[in-house]
């Protein structure tokens, strides 16, 4: 657990206990899947707009927390007896939580259509457009550039420090509009540039569907 290992005042995550069909507590066997979504900034609003669609299929909670704060909150809640089957998050926040999570984590990943939509929106704002993605840039980006003969500056990041550096580099090169996840758009706007949010309701919906399916499969195998 990284910096938490060996820290006496911070408890480790409790171990998951598996039950067979005969011994599994009735509440666990019959309840809906429980999903916790950890997000920051604009992604919170997107999650809040989609989660009501799943009210009959799962118990989904949204936490406005990220990185160490999210890990600590989840640890404390689980030690207090709260149950959760799957985490959902995105980008660097999701990657960090996944490294420490005792349950599966599903990442909210922008679709090819999300990339094309966001770039088209950015191009309406300025011809000086850049995109910063978590990890490798989607293949659709190159297709978009070739199709329209556009020069779009692109960068990738793994950590928040990378994200800050990438956006600053783009703005120093005259980029006026930056496309990316909420962390990227927040940085761009703080630097006086326009930000276009990359994620969509469709991407969130897909991640929640996958999380619910993972929870159902895991409980069936317990």
Where on the chain are the PLM-derived regions?
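Non-catalytic structural scaffold of enzyme domains
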Residues: 7-222
